[in-house]
Design a protein with these regions (language model features):
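Beta-strand-rich domains and repeat architectures in extracellular enzymes and scaffolds
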Residues: 131-167, 180-193
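Short loop/turn segments that connect beta-strands within beta-propeller blades
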Residues: 170-175, 213-217, 253-256, 298-302, ...
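Conserved beta-strand positions in repeat-built beta-propeller and related beta-rich domains
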Residues: 153-161, 201-206, 241-246, 286-290, ...
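Short, compositionally biased P/S/T/A/G/V-rich stretches that sit at domain boundaries
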Residues: 4-5, 15-44, 57
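Surface-exposed, short loops/turns at beta-strand junctions within beta-sandwich domains
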Residues: 86-94
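Beta-rich, blade/repeat-based domains predominating
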Residues: 138-149, 185-195, 225-236, 268-280, ...
Length: 353
């Protein structure tokens, strides 16, 4: 019995020392500083904003980073902090703002929040006028359209995994498929564009860009990339590629390396699901997957300058087909053509601003 009492007393004494120690350590896990907002923060491009933060008086050597770069430091911060952020120094898009520092005991802490820089442009609302209706092959799951001179090229996908993906020369006036090259059933064809004497075709999940000779359609080489492949276009110098998100990657056509990335935003939100792309008079026209809208994008900033309502095309042209997809611009005649996946009709359209 005495042994039991001694053991109980020892445990009690140890507990009287250990419990406060654990409680103290637990209390110290709370960061000595925090931002003055809990959810994502959205600011407009061009604004200079003051982001609030506060400390409990125990923080020191606090560093603020934005997009991975240091923007402000506080050696002995006050309890109320004001973090200055000039949005003009950054591209529009999503960023992380981080607060790093230590408490009086030297314990390191980090606080992270998300900040989005929105466009300062309210998109205009444009519409489409149907100028002419042309036949389109209903078996073509259109993923990309592009002109080289007067020759129309089409890239298709393969939703049934039967090896139907291809790149083909198409007769604009009849819709007939001429010379073509097919992909095996393991590869799902996506957007196409033409630069010089080469055709670039993306694949959806294979992480491959296929490069063909424009005249012979001979496969010349393949480039690797890490994302999904959706749409692609060119300004005659570089390639612009979408991956189904709000991001557009600017790529070097010689090696497919990323030159830079832009994010596509309106003055209110990001525009995800960017699909087929076409470069038209200095701007990128992008189908927005599962919608009847086409985004008109500044390729330098990612700002959406206009949203085109193509509902009239969908209502007339879809038939038993699927979504609107496919934009081709004929530069010499300044004419634009649009269609959709498995659509029986190709439309020559005029943009009404």
């Amino acid at each position: 019995m005495k042994k039991i009492l001694v053991i109980v007393l020892v445990i009690g004494l140890l507990g009287s020392y250990l419990v406060p120690m654990f409680m103290k350590d637990s209390a110290n896990t709370e960061a000595p500083f925090q931002f003055g907002f809990s959810d994502n923060l959205a600011i407009k491009y061009g604004d200079v904003v003051s982001i609030p933060a506060e400390t409990n008086g125990e923080a020191k050597n606090v560093t603020i980073t934005f997009g991975g770069k240091v923007i402000q430091k506080f050696a002995q911060p006050k309890e109320k902090l004001s973090i200055q952020l000039d949005s003009k120094k950054y591209q529009i898009g999503a960023y992380e703002i981080e607060m790093h520092g230590v408490d009086q005991q030297g314990q390191y802490f980090t606080e992270i929040r998300n900040v989005r820089i929105l466009s300062d442009v309210t998109p205009e609302k444009w519409k489409l006028e149907i100028v002419r209706r042309l036949p389109h092959n209903e078996s073509s799951f259109t993923q990309g359209l592009a002109f080289s001179g007067d020759q129309l090229y089409e890239g298709t996908g393969d939703p049934n995994q039967t090896g139907a993906s291809l790149v083909a020369k198409v007769n604009l006036n009849t819709g007939e498929i001429g010379q073509k090259i097919g992909l095996d059933a393991t590869r799902f064809g996506e957007g196409i564009t033409i630069l010089g004497d080469q055709i670039f075709q993306l694949t959806w999940l294979n992480h491959k860009c296929l490069v063909y000779n424009k005249e012979t359609l001979e496969l010349l080489k393949e480039f690797d990339y890490s994302t999904e492949g959706w749409g692609i276009c060119t300004d005659g110098k570089v390639l612009f590629m979408s991956d189904g998100s709000e991001r557009i990657y600017v790529r070097n056509p010689k090696n497919f390396d990323i030159i830079k990335t832009i994010e596509v935003y309106t003055n209110e939100f990001a525009i995800p699901r960017l699909n087929e792309l076409e470069f038209v008079n200095g701007l990128i026209y992008a189908n927005i997957w599962t919608s009847n809208e086409i985004a008109v994008i500044d390729p330098l900033s990612g700002k959406v300058l206009a949203l085109i309502d193509a509902t009239n095309l969908v209502n007339e042209g879809k038939g038993n087909g699927e979504v609107l997809n496919g934009i081709a611009y004929h530069a010499k005649s300044n004419k634009m053509y649009m269609t959709g996946k498995f659509w029986p009709t190709m439309f020559e359209v005029k943009v009404l601003k």
